[in-house]
Amino acid sequence: MGDITVVLGIGAAVLLISVIAVRVSIRLGLPSLLLYLGIGVLLGESVFGIKFDDADLTQSLGIAALVLILTEGGLTTRWHAVKTSLWLGVALSTVAVAVSVAVTGTALHFLLGLDWRMALLWGAVLSSTDAAAVFSVLRSLGVGARLTGALELESGLNDAPVYIAVVLLASADKISWTAPLLVLYELAAGALIGVLLGVFGAAALRRAALPATGLYPLATVAVCVIAYTAGDLVHASGFLAVYVAALALGNARLPHRADTLSFAEGLGWLAQIGLFVLLGLYASPSRLLDALVPALIAGVVLTFVARPLSVVLASLPFKVPWREQAFLSWSGLRGAVPIVFALIPLIQGVEGARDLVDAVFVLVIVLTAVQGSTLPFLARRLGLVNLHEAQEVQVDSSPLDELGAELLQVHIQRGSKLHGVYMTELRLPSGATVSLVVRSGKSFTPQPTTRLQVDDQLLIVTTEEARDAAERRIRAVDRAGRYARWKGETGD
């Protein structure tokens, strides 16, 4: 009992300090991920004396945390916000990765004297942008759906090809001519598994009459984790499978969707905190100083040569303006993922892999501090920040099983064209009606002359048959205003 009490006490204290660190990081203008790493380093052998050097366990826990982070990222990504950036995001996560690996690897082969295998391993590991870092920074900037969508898709999708590249390079003596076919199979099969489990999982959850609201978020996350394991079992990309499944589930008509997203967000934060503290605990400060020079050389090549060149080449077919290209080039945020991937060659006994781990750790600290703290400034200087960008209306549903009906909860956001619309202008389908409006903490039954306002919350009772049409109509008016056509403007 004594040991578990100490472990629980230390774990809870670290978690509480990490939560407080979020507030501190905002005040200091630094990414909170750096503070989590710092907490882990302080807990380590050099300060508080906790010795932890198990690379296998670190990698296993790191992959588990990454699965949860990708789950949260996929669930909270709105399809309509990223669909216009889909192919740009795919290009950044494939073409840009290949260019970055080639350019970085070639440069480090000559600059650091690394053999080709190790040089390309450096390039592959450093090419992965971190989903946790990107999600935590971008969503508060207000740089527009196109850029945010492209970067979120890139960070969610590029783990798969990078992981495959690292595994292949770490076992370079086993690579055959079938390697490109293997890569294509892993990506295609991973995406297919994600789509199938996401679609069928959403259908099952809609039909499940679970006895408690809190079970829906648990079931949703479980489906996403199953997608990862299913992909891994058939030697497909589990990372791609979990992200695609989460994306499909997050954009499906799920019961208690708001509760699910809140749960996923909390789980994502827990995974981020645990992962970065763990990696900080694993790091050896005495070795990091020796890795400083090669890490900085790699950082300069990656930041000022490989990343910009890869962005330019990947975005050529999409006619991306130079300002957006500059922002995309500076937004390749690194975090825990490169460190976790760097452990793969170390575990497989590749010569020089320990130096790679140390250099990547240093580079993550430097790039996160520099890029993460300057990204808001750069976005403003490039004129990409839109302070008045409209936010999507929030619609949640709760099943009313005994009545054969559902309750839609609608929250009118800033910039929504629902503002100023009269109740009669909503023109909801037959079987749906606004039963209550909550405004400034007070609720009332709306009249035909009631005019909607920003921050109003509407409770709409609808039959199961009219539910989809009611939500489409609400989203249509949210986007196009009172004159949104019943047919043609769906809001999707």
Predicted region positions:
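Transmembrane helical cores of multi-pass secondary ion antiporters/exchangers
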Residues: 1-388, 392, 401-402
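Sequence-level motif detector for i,i+2 pairs with an aromatic at +2
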Residues: 38, 405-407, 432
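Short, solvent-exposed amphipathic alpha-helical segments in soluble enzyme
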Residues: 346, 383, 426-428, 451-453, ...
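Long, charged amphipathic helices and adjacent flexible linkers at domain junctions
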Residues: 387-410, 479-492
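C-terminal end-of-chain micro-motif
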Residues: 1, 453, 490-492
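Short, glycine/charged-rich beta-strand-loop motifs at protein surfaces that mediate ligand recognition
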Residues: 300, 408-413
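Surface-exposed interaction regions enriched in Ser/Thr/Asp/Glu
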Residues: 463-464, 468-483
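Cytosolic Rossmann-like ligand/nucleotide-binding regulatory domains
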Residues: 414, 418-465, 470
